[in-house]
């Protein structure tokens, strides 16, 4: 994206939010598309790579949802203490192998 595109986006659009990759999302103030919806765009942090958009922001960009996504903090990893030490028996004692 050229610097002039970034200038016009920041001038004519309102900033809606940022994701964890520091991409900035904008929505137009008064420019609407042919379906009557406001235009939405993204300014990428580093290179213009569409795979760097999280699924929640992707659905917002393509008008699948109208709610602005929130950054959800994930919990840190914890060890599962509910795992039993003794494994259940897998052999069935009632089973007799067939012998011809």
Swiss-Prot record:
GO cellular component: respiratory chain complex I
GO biological process: response to oxidative stress
InterPro entries referenced in this protein's UniProt entry, alphabetically: NDUFA12 (IPR007763)
Taxonomy, superkingdom: Bacteria
Pfam families recorded: NDUFA12
Database matches in NCBIfam families: PRK06630.1
Protein name, UniProt field: Uncharacterized protein RP725
């Amino acid at each position: 994206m050229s610097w002039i595109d970034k200038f016009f986006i920041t001038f004519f659009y309102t900033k809606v939010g940022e994701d964890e990759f520091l991409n900035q999302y904008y929505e137009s103030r008064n420019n609407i598309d042919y379906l009557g919806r406001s235009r939405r765009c993204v300014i990428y942090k580093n290179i213009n790579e569409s795979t760097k958009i999280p699924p929640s922001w992707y659905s917002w960009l393509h008008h699948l949802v109208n709610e602005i996504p929130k950054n959800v903090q994930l919990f840190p990893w914890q060890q599962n203490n509910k795992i039993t030490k003794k494994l259940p028996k897998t052999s069935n004692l009632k089973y007799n192998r067939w012998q011809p």
